[in-house]
Amino acid sequence: MSLPLPESFVASMRQMLGDDAERLFVALDTEPVVSIRLNPYKSAKVFDGEAIGWSKWGRYLAERPQFTLDPMMHGGAYYVQEASSQFVGYLLKDDSLESKRVLDMCAAPGGKTTIYSTLVGREGLVVANDINHSRTLALADNVQRWGLGNVVVTCNEPSHIGAFEHWFDIVAVDAPCSGEGMFRKMEEARTEWTPSSVDVCVARQKEILAEAWRTLRPGGKLLYSTCTFNDREDEGVVKWLMEEYGDNLEAVERVELDDRWGIVRGDIGAFQCFHFYPHRVQGEGFFVAVARKRDDSIRRVVPKSRRKVFAQLQNKDVAEVSHWVDTPKQMTFKLIGDMVYGYDNAVVDDIVHLSESLSVVYSGVAMGQIFKGKLKPEHPLALFVGCNDSVVPTVEVSLDDALDYLRRQDISASQFEEGINIVSYGGVAIGFIKRIGARCNNMYPKDLRIIKL
């Protein structure tokens, strides 16, 4: 990268890392490593690359393909995610997270959210929050592609989330930071960085963590992470956590590392801390710390409802919607306006509480609308791993047809049966299409379409 590193950053890294800083600076001017994470719920044959040691489903790629032109990415077969940040899944790999609640406090664009979604399974719940509404829309799109139907996307200040005291089994704060770990990938990260931005970030990180702490149940794990290197936002904030909450923190089981990974460990009190430096690991700059809240008996707090959000479906409509999913007895269907949403029975009550107290952007699975007694399916239903694909035909299409479909262009109707079909590429559903005689109505959402090939 031609743009030089900020001088103050260079000086601070030399003070913090000594001679090792020069190797970091060299690495920050090399090409970033390309990596993805496979969706284990969608058994697609994609990318047989080198495995990422700390990520069961992570893969390195030898070069960066045009991901936009891969229909399987649009179908949620994998998520494009740099390797270092996938380590949060490794920190939770020994936890029995099925049916548990996870809060991803600063979730957009959703890479870590989809890790947590995978870990808790279809009977678990992930609340993915971001304070920026436009970012939550992108977050919701990525959650829909991943297709597990177990995420609630919210757009709230941390203080609003904090009202759900002792609610979550895992609380993850991937905090807004000065972004030093992005210096290799993004030129604007270098231009926007200033010493004062670090001060602003530290203050904001502490505010968010104070609210996040309230939501963590006794015995639950707290994960704090940044994509920056400096010890003020990383170790400094962890030391603050120990000062504020140390009496109620304890260490988790020691996290075992392979020396070949190059991860730098530096524990602080109850926290196990991990630094990822791009001159040591195959990944970008990242920091994460983990500890457990002491297991004292404190009752869960459910905020009082502010409003009613859901309406009940008529029995005949429930019957119509139910046959579109593979486990209808395990799901509850509710109305928001004229849109039917599906939720696993294990979490539907929790989602009702959340929806009545928070600003929910998306939740569960948007199934569609009832029109003349029939479900007109919505796009997320096609991507849902629990979609009953025997209800309508599933048609495997060519790459050219798949790309035309994703552009909302016309494709040959002769390959589809009359009525609604699922369009599939590489064994992965990418959306619905409706054949009407000799033509097809492309049902791919306009706001998701590929603009340029």
Give each language-model segment a name.
Residues 1-43, 294-453:
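Polybasic, low-complexity RNA-engagement segments
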Residues 97-100, 160-172:
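A short acidic, Gly/Pro-enriched loop at the edge of an enzyme's catalytic core
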Residues 109-122:
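Conserved SAM-binding loop of SAM-dependent methyltransferases across substrates and taxa
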Residues 120-121, 216-218:
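Helix-to-beta-strand junctions that scaffold the AdoMet/dcAdoMet cofactor pocket
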Residues 129-166:
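S-adenosyl-L-methionine
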Residues 134, 169-210, 227-235, 256, ...:
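Mobile active-site "lid"/loop adjacent to the S-adenosyl-L-methionine
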Residues 228-342, 347-348, 431:
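C-terminal catalytic and target-recognition region of SAM-dependent MTase-like enzymes
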